[in-house]
Amino acid sequence: MLCLCLYVPVHNSDQIEVEYFESNGLPSELKSLKSLSVLLPSQEFSTYRRWRKKSLKTEEKEHDGQLDFEEFVHYLQDHEKDLKLVFKSMDRKIAGQVNANDIVNSLRDLGVHISLKQAEKVLKSMDKNGTMTIDWNEWKKYPTLQPAENIPEIILYWKHSTIFDVGESLMVPDEFTVEEHLTGMWWRHLVSGGGAGAVSRTCTAPLDRLKVLMQVHGCQGKSMCLMSGLTQMIKEGGVRSLWRGNGINVIKIAPETALKFMAYEQIKRVMGSSQETLGISERFVAGSLAGVIAQSTIYPMEVLKTRLALRKTGQYKGISDCAKHILKTEGMSAFYKGYVPNMLGIIPYAGIDLAVYETLKNTWLQRYGTENADPGVFVLLACGTVSSTCGQLASYPLALIRTRMQAQASVEGSSQVSMTGLFKQIMKTEGPTGLYRGLTPNFLKVIPAVSISYVVYEHIKSTLGVRSR
């Protein structure tokens, strides 16, 4: 492509030098999108059309196919600004040049891992003088109509913990771009995630309560399966009893999400990271610490959830009555029963969930993400389901011990046993399989929980004015 400089008058500005690529004598007086599509490579033209669709107001979207040249100039200006931001973010030494290591490090900070050889291959496609470094002039000439926002879009498209809610709040928080912080989009994403979690948990509450019953009562000599458990719940308290404990489970979403997000941002500052996003290991450390802080604060609500899920008809009048009863009969310490295994469970859950999700994400990006960072609904749901399932499988024994410790005083004939004592007791009387009681309903709720939370998240996000990119 030959480079051509034009001086084009743009509204409310002086004459602006606009540099773009001429393809086979591309004329300056283009009249229609059809003409442009003939002269430009299909990938570059589709990128321009996506940009145009995003920038147009709703009432202007049904246009007549005519291309306004002034509008095309604005596109080139916006594109060059995006390129400049990406170049500066990679040029950490402020040397005015970017090498293969800079590309590797920048992508690693975004959770995308490529080899030095792959980075050199990318570099060679832009390097015109064979120095294996590129300056700003070489960088901005790398096809003007290619999507410059591809790297930041990885963060925007691959949200994980904000979108998917499987009932366990142990995931590492998602990263937000500088743009999302400045525009206030971050809180819209969090509100959307909170609303999605509320709907998702409510829809899967019967399976969640069944899991708790199987974890606690499955050790009392009677085997409890899915159908017998559901039948027992309905027989004892009617259909409404299937949702016992769901109220407090939904209420705790807001404070826990807010605490985790604020703690995560503060920990990032303490860690002294100057980058927009953290690397995988840093995210794991910061996310785990944020999870510990949030869980420590709202843990009494976790105990209340378990007690309310196990309650019999007429035992408590509501959440406050249950809290008063526990405080009166067992004391304040009862609200932190099972705290240690719960905290220990954060590490395997958060670590494996993050590692699996990032591995799946990187695999997809390396194979299919060269042209577009948007993975599509199916890929996102599949990655979220697999990573959440792996995380829960690894931390499930600790979750079961936590639940039994929370329920000790509410189970007749149950003695107060420590975490290690309870582990030994389960292994002795039930064997290794005893550590996985209730796993079936827990896994059965993952796919519907992930699917429901994604659909509701997208709907609320759209209502709050967050457009899908």
Curated annotation (Swiss-Prot):
GO terms for cellular component: mitochondrial inner membrane. Its main location: mitochondrion. The chain crosses the membrane at residues 190-207, 245-264, 288-301, 338-357, 381-398, 438-457. One of its GO terms (molecular function) is calcium ion binding. The keyword Repressor does not apply. It is found in: Mitochondrion inner membrane. Residues 1-189, 265-287, 358-380, 458-469 are mitochondrial intermembrane. Coiled coil: none annotated. Residues 208-244, 302-337, 399-437 are mitochondrial matrix. Residues 47-80, 78-113, 114-149 form the EF-hand domain. Pfam families: Mito_carr. SUPFAM superfamilies: EF-hand, Mitochondrial carrier. Keywords: Calcium, Membrane, Metal-binding, Mitochondrion, Mitochondrion inner membrane, Repeat, Transmembrane, Transmembrane helix, Transport. The keyword Hydrolase does not apply. Solcar repeats lie at residues 184-270, 278-363, 375-463. It is a multi-pass membrane protein. Ca(2+) binds at D64, Q66, E71. GO terms for biological process: ADP transport; ATP transport. Disulfide bonds: none annotated. PANTHER family: SOLUTE CARRIER FAMILY 25. Calcium-dependent mitochondrial solute carrier. Belongs to the mitochondrial carrier (TC 2.A.29) family. This is Calcium-binding mitochondrial carrier protein SCaMC-2-A. It comes from Danio rerio. The gene is slc25a25a.
